[in-house]
Amino acid sequence: MTKQSILAFFLLLLVACHHTHQVPGTVPVYYSDDRSVSLLPTSAMTEQVDMPQRIEGKFTKTDGSTDSFEADSWVRANDSILSITLFTGFGTTLGEITYVRDSVHAESSVMDVAKFKTEYLIADFQVCFYPYESLRKNFEKAGFVFSEVRSGSGNADYIRTLSENGKTILTASKIGGEITLVNELRHYSYHITLGEGK
């Protein structure tokens, strides 16, 4: 087999395995069984994020067993785009999720992204990084209670809690360069270590 035919084979394999998936930005995100919210528009993002992040996740399967994942990522978020690119420890791109204008687009050459509800990942990112007031209004419009506690004015650390009928659904906390999101209702969590931004 020649080098050209080997290269052609691998290119064909990459193209054949490439998956894309797109959903409208107005698709509902159910934080409880009865209530949902729409994603906030990217224009609600008042800060700029352009940095590496380390993401570690854990979730409980329906049979009660747990599973976990971890990935390096580069996150770019501003008032026009939210983009999360996931990498392996060797720097190989696993996939990219992009939220721009009115749709969420995901693509990967190693994962079938159509099986993932990528809008939920975007929604959780918004809980961690978007301005509190915009989030509060969006959640309260749907009948949830969303609160934030900070230890002082100007302090970037926070504890954010989403609840319904007095029951906590999720908590997101930021302490220094660490963010932890725990969804008690859906039994999953993320731990994000923030890197140095541009």
Residue positions per predicted region:
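Mature, soluble, non-transmembrane domains
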Residues: 18-34, 42, 56-58, 74, ...
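Structural recognition of beta-strand segments within beta-rich domains
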Residues: 64-91
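C-terminal motif of bacterial Sec signal peptides marking the signal peptidase cleavage site
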Residues: 13-16
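Sec-dependent signal peptide recognition
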Residues: 2-9
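Short acidic/polar alpha-helix capping motifs at helix-coil junctions
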Residues: 34-36, 69-70
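A short, Trp-centered hydrophobic/proline-enriched beta-strand micro-motif
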Residues: 41-64
